[in-house]
């Protein structure tokens, strides 16, 4: 109608459409996405990173999908972090898992009963995630990495930009839903 390609809707249809839009937009029918609001309001003028849901307490459990809030290159690095299909006519998913967060990190639903319902997947070389941590007590820690994969790979851990362990090997578990624990012992955290 607004492009002049059809006749005007009836008053009844217009009112019904407006009322449906109002109902669909009601706060009770929507889900608050902390990362989306942060990206639209704060990140447009700041590269600062913030904890996703408060700092991760160590000792404790850290979920990969709860990496810090912040822009690409500051809170995370991902090979396919945006889609430019408007300019290129070639759609590319920026989050190949299509779940949980609107950033470029590939997050998908997880069947792991020890997880938070999500897993980071589709990882490739030079991708990384940043986490704010609160180390309760200096000392040596064992780190358990819970993962599932159809191929082997490696990852490293840094604290304040300083490597604390390189090349933790994660082996093929045979399936993206066959989760196993990888123990890395004796990491000193100040």
Please tell me what each predicted stretch does.
Residues 16-20:
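Low-complexity, serine/threonine/proline-enriched polar segments
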């Amino acid at each position: 109608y607004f492009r002049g390609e059809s006749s005007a809707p009836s008053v009844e249809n217009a009112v019904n459409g407006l009322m449906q839009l109002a109902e669909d937009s009601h706060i009770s029918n929507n889900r608050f996405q902390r990362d989306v609001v942060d990206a639209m309001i704060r990140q447009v003028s700041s590269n600062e990173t913030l904890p996703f849901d408060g700092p991760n307490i160590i000792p404790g459990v850290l979920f990969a999908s709860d990496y810090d809030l912040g822009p690409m290159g500051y809170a995370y690095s991902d090979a396919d972090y945006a889609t430019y299909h408007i300019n290129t006519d070639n759609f590319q998913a920026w989050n190949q898992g299509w779940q949980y967060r609107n950033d470029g990190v590939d997050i998908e639903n997880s069947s792991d009963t020890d997880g938070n319902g999500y897993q980071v997947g589709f990882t490739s070389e030079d991708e990384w995630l940043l986490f704010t941590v609160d180390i309760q007590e200096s000392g040596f820690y064992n780190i358990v990495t819970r993962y599932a994969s159809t191929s082997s790979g490696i990852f490293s851990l840094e604290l304040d930009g300083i490597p604390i362990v390189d090349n933790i090997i994660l082996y093929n578990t045979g399936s993206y839903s066959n989760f196993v624990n990888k123990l890395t012992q004796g990491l000193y955290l100040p």
